[in-house]
């Protein structure tokens, strides 16, 4: 049984990459609802000035729209969309699709971290996940425990960590790629459970405390 699904992306030249991302996401959710496990996407209107960006956004949207989190369900109600082919006239399509897959998989990984409850994702499990990434990717990983952070004078972080029975840690990832390239540093907040601070969260927002 074949199902034809049409997803609007806007009008012609006004279409931006995010239009394609949203349309593909909506299509993936509709296919999931229809219990489709395989799909073929035809995207003839990608051929404009931003065709490469549009194609990447389309694939990202398809991945993200098909995302489900069933870890704590005894039985998933529907099988997720697991295979899709994209028909495109963009010459560099293969490389673009690969980049989109990497980007979307990273987003889905972050979604998994957020969707897990605070008693599952702790500073220790975050550190363990970082170690796994270091084994799969060319990364140098340093994990600082309470003793090392105390020696480094990281008293603010340690003070915040005292609010939990799970001890804090700090993860540093280093990628040594092109040695001649400028040095770039990213600092990200990875609080696994944020119960307040100077702005106490009301009960309506308690479900978002694990989102940081």
Task: Say what each PLM segment does.
Residues 200-212:
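Acidic/histidine-rich catalytic neighborhood of metal-dependent amide-processing enzymes
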Residues 1-190, 195, 208:
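Short amphipathic alpha-helical segment within the helicase RecA-like ATPase core
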């Amino acid at each position: 049984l074949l199902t034809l699904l049409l997803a609007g992306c806007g009008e012609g030249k006004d279409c931006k990459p995010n239009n394609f991302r949203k349309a593909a996401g909506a299509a993936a959710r509709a296919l999931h609802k229809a219990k489709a496990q395989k799909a073929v996407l035809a995207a003839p209107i990608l051929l404009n000035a931003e065709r490469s960006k549009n194609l990447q956004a389309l694939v990202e949207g398809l991945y993200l729209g098909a995302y489900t989190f069933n870890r704590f369900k005894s039985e998933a109600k529907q099988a997720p969309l697991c295979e899709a082919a994209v028909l495109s006239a963009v010459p560099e399509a293969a490389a673009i699709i690969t980049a989109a897959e990497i980007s979307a998989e990273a987003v889905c990984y972050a979604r998994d971290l957020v969707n897990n409850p605070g008693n599952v994702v702790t500073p220790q499990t975050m550190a363990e996940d970082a170690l796994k990434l270091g084994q799969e990717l060319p990364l140098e990983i340093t994990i600082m425990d309470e003793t090392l952070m105390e020696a480094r004078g990281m008293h603010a972080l340690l003070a915040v960590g005292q609010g939990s029975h799970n001890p804090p840690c700090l993860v540093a990832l280093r990628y040594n790629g092109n040695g001649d390239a400028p040095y770039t540093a990213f600092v990200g907040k990875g609080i696994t459970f944020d119960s307040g601070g100077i702005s106490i969260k009301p009960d309506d927002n308690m479900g978002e405390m694990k989102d940081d």
